[in-house]
């Protein structure tokens, strides 16, 4: 990875000069204090709370972690990272934090710009895209990423539990030319239409829209099935790699399974990333096949809810009508679309993916603050949610 030379920036609101450089192991204690000052004791990411994981990320050649240091005091004023992984050309912008004493001076934007200029440039280690999940308690974080070339792609209601349940917004920025190589999809289940129209307006695409068709019939249900959760991260990782030795047989960038859901009769296994602090879960892969587990989705989400999970998501190819229909049948909502997310094996084109979500808790949008560019995605989600959960009323003649 390209090394980062030190740069200086002046935050206009406070007239304080900061120096931006790569994070170092000696910064870990100060970084933990920074994240506590910004997020309190509820920050769910290991990047700001776990010294061992922070040390690993600082040394990771696929992660670029920058810090901003006040030139006058030497204290950390801000931090942000783009985290990647071997074999993938997707990065995640995470850990963006600016100390309360240094806000309103543009430091968040300066850090984001410095990261993106290096990881979305023209070098051999260039990423195809970088995504961010952004808080919606105020428009500030949304505007920071928007000003740095990120586009809104959806809303993820109840996605994380900080001091209370919060909704997040998905944003992404692509390297030049990537979006021009999206693979067209001939048809999609009709409930995806509001989301796809919104994404087309955001990206400014004017090509033909996919044909909308009714969702496929739901697979035979097994709602009464009994499942067990195995939370032994090292064991789950080993078993996952035994089941999926070929990396092309599954796709969920930057998520490593740490939990395993197993049917009592051994009919299937579902590998998931379960975050106990944030009380959310990502369904990553199923063995022997996603189709086998599709009929158990109700039992899977019920088991996760009983285990304290308030939000479940899955990443589904836009071209896979059957799996999308299966998730729709179990109350999952098409909440976001990641265009040009996965490259073809030959690298000629890119495939879109849909983020399907389901929350077991009441959604309260009264505390959600969205910028103008994000509002259409909130409207699209509400439309899809209403179509899923509100009955169609017929007026008697």
Residue map of PLM features:
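Non-catalytic interaction/regulatory modules that flank or connect domains
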Residues: 207-313
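C-terminal "cap" of GNAT-fold acetyltransferases
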Residues: 160-192, 343-381
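Conserved GNAT acetyl-CoA-binding A-motif
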Residues: 119-135, 306-316
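Conserved catalytic-core motifs of GNAT/GCN5-like acyltransferases
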Residues: 131-133, 149-168, 333-347
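Compositionally biased, intrinsically disordered low-complexity segments enriched
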Residues: 2-18
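A conserved beta-strand-loop-helix scaffold within acyl/acetyltransferase catalytic domains
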Residues: 28, 32-100, 245-280, 286-288
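Conserved acetyl-CoA-binding loop-helix of GNAT-fold acetyltransferases
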Residues: 98, 104-120, 147, 290-303
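Short amphipathic alpha-helix that is part of the acyltransferase structural core
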Residues: 15-49, 67-70, 169, 177, ...
């Amino acid at each position: 990875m390209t090394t980062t030379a030190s740069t200086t920036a002046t935050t206009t609101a406070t007239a304080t000069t900061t120096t931006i450089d790569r994070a170092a192991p000696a910064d870990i204690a100060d970084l933990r204090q920074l994240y506590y000052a910004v997020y309190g004791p509820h920050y769910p990411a290991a990047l700001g709370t776990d010294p061992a994981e922070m040390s690993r990320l600082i040394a990771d050649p696929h992660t670029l972690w920058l810090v901003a240091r006040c030139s006058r005091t030497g204290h950390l004023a801000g931090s942000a990272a783009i985290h990647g992984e071997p074999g993938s050309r997707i990065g995640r912008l995470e850990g963006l934090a600016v100390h309360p004493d240094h806000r309103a001076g543009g430091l968040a934007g300066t850090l984001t710009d410095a990261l993106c200029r290096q990881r979305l440039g023209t070098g051999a280690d260039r990423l195809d895209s970088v995504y961010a999940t952004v808080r919606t308690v105020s428009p500030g974080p949304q505007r920071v990423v928007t000003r740095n070339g990120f586009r809104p792609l959806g809303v993820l209601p109840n996605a994380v539990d900080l001091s209370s349940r919060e909704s997040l917004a998905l944003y992404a920025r692509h390297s030049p030319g990537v979006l021009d190589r999206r693979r067209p999809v001939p048809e999609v289940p009709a409930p995806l239409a509001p989301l796809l129209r919104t994404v087309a307006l955001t990206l400014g695409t004017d090509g033909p829209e996919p044909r909308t068709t009714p969702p496929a019939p739901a697979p035979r249900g097994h709602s009464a099935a009994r499942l067990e959760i195995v939370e032994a991260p090292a064991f789950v990782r080993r078993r996952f790699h035994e089941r999926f030795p070929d990396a092309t047989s599954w796709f969920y960038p930057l998520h490593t399974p740490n939990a395993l859901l197993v049917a009592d009769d051994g009919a299937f296994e579902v590998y998931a990333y379960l975050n106990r602090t944030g009380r959310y879960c990502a369904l990553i892969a199923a063995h022997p096949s996603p189709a086998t587990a599709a009929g158990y989705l109700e039992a899977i989400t019920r088991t996760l809810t009983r285990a304290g999970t308030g939000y479940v998501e899955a990443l589904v190819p836009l071209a896979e009508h059957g799996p999308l229909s299966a998730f729709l049948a179990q109350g999952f909502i098409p909440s976001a679309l990641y265009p040009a997310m996965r490259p073809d094996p030959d690298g000629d084109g890119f495939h879109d993916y849909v983020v399907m979500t389901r929350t077991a808790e009441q959604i309260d949008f009264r505390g959600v603050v969205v910028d103008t560019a994000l509002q259409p995605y909130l409207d699209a989600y509400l439309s899809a949610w209403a179509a899923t959960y509100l009955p169609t009323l017929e007026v008697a003649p």
